[in-house]
Amino acid sequence: MKIKLKICGMKFSENIQEIADLQPDFLGFIFYENSVRNYTENSIIYIPESIKKVGVFVNERHEKIIKTIQKYDLNIIQLHGNETESYCLELINQLNHNQLNTKIIKSFLVDDYFVFQTLNYYQMVDYFLFDTKGILPGGNGTKFNWEILEKYHLEKPYFL
């Protein structure tokens, strides 16, 4: 399995360019007003097509996600809140209705007591993301015990 690199929290043009020059696989832009890394520019500077643009959302309305995908030409969206199975299914319907071929990452906050059977309800998404359960939504600057991933037995690719 090839390891891929996703760098998230892109906000400033000069920083985006410097990181893009390093050719990561994915660049993440946060579209969550309560985040200090919320991306508010009118456009994203040129990024080579080989780098996929990821939009990160937290419990956002489908309509706003669709508009943001279209505005910034996002390749992937990351759902980093309490989005339910039915929320994800409806979002997929909206993406299809708008003829958007946008992939979906669904994040899960993991601690030593995470119930991996929960993932069975989210088979409709393209990827999972396992993040440390912390105070804030999104990255908290700490890692969880990766040994817990020995309990992961699905085929779906995931991010850490």
Where are these regions (language model features)?
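Conserved N-terminal beta1-alpha1 strand-loop-helix module at the mouth
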Residues: 1-160
